[in-house]
Regions:
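A short glycine-rich, Lys/Arg-flanked "PGG" loop and its adjoining helix->strand segment in the class I
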Residues: 141-156
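Conserved class I S-adenosyl-L-methionine
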Residues: 2-55, 74
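Phosphate-coordination loops involved in phosphoryl transfer and adenosine-cofactor binding
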Residues: 58
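Class I SAM-dependent methyltransferase SAM/SAH-binding core
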Residues: 62-64, 68-117
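A conserved beta-strand element that flanks and buttresses the S-adenosyl-L-methionine
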Residues: 129
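Short catalytic micro-motifs in class I SAM-dependent methyltransferases
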Residues: 132-133
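Short N-terminal helix/helix-N-cap motif within the alpha/beta-hydrolase-1
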Residues: 92, 137-142
Length: 159
C-alpha cells in the first residue's frame, strides 16, 4: 500500500527532504532531544520494547532515517553499538548529526540515501534499525527487502 493515495514516491521524498532540511538546525531543541542520561534511558527503553528483551551489544549497525541522530548517538554512548552508520534523505539532518557526534566525541558515518536503495554490500550489518521512520518511506516492501539484503545472517531488524 502506498504512503499516499495521490502523491508519487518522488513527491513524498521531496517534501520530506525539504521539510527536514529546513527544520534540521532547530530540530533537537524543538523536540527536546537529549544525548545525556535521560536520552540514553529513553532510547534503551524503546530498543528493549522493540526487541522484547534486553539488547545485546551489536557490532556494526545501520540506522534508517536517522534524522539528527537521537538513536544512533545514544546507542553508541551506551556501548550497545560498536560502529554506527546513519542514513537519511535529508543532508541537513545528517549535518546536524555530524556536529552533535563531534561535540560528543563520537564517530558515526553518515550517508545520504533512500531506504529503498541502500548503497551497501550484502551482509554488512549486525543491526538494521530505525525510529519514527516507517511512515516516511513510500515503498516499505522494497525498503524491507533492502534491510534484509544488507543484514548479516543472524542479524537483527528493529523498528
Amino acid at each position: 500500500m502506498p504512503a499516499s493515495p495521490t502523491a508519487t514516491a518522488a513527491e513524498i521524498k521531496d517534501v520530506n527532504t525539504r521539510y527536514h532540511d529546513a527544520a534540521a538546525d532547530s530540530y533537537d531543541a524543538k523536540w527536546g532531544i537529549d544525548y545525556g542520561e535521560v536520552g540514553q534511558a529513553q532510547v534503551r527503553g524503546k530498543l528493549v520494547k522493540a526487541l522484547g528483551h534486553e539488547p545485546e551489544v551489536f557490532g556494526v549497525a545501520l540506522e534508517i532515517g536517522s534524522g539528527t541522530g537521537y538513536f544512533s548517538l545514544n546507542l553508541v554512548q551506551l556501548g550497545l553499538i560498536e560502529r554506527a552508520t546513519a542514513t537519511d534523505i535529508s543532508p541537513g539532518m545528517l549535518a546536524t548529526l555530524g556536529r552533535s557526534a563531534s561535540e560528543l566525541g563520537l564517530e558515526v558515518e553518515t550517508v545520504c540515501t533512500e531506504a529503498e536503495t541502500l548503497p551497501f554490500a550484502d551482509d554488512s550489518f549486525d543491526l538494521v534499525f530505525g525510529h519514527a521512520i516507517l511512515h516516511h518511506i513510500p515503498d516499505l516492501g522494497r525498503a524491507f527487502s533492502e534491510f534484509e539484503r544488507v543484514l548479516r545472517p543472524g542479524g537483527t531488524v528493529a523498528f
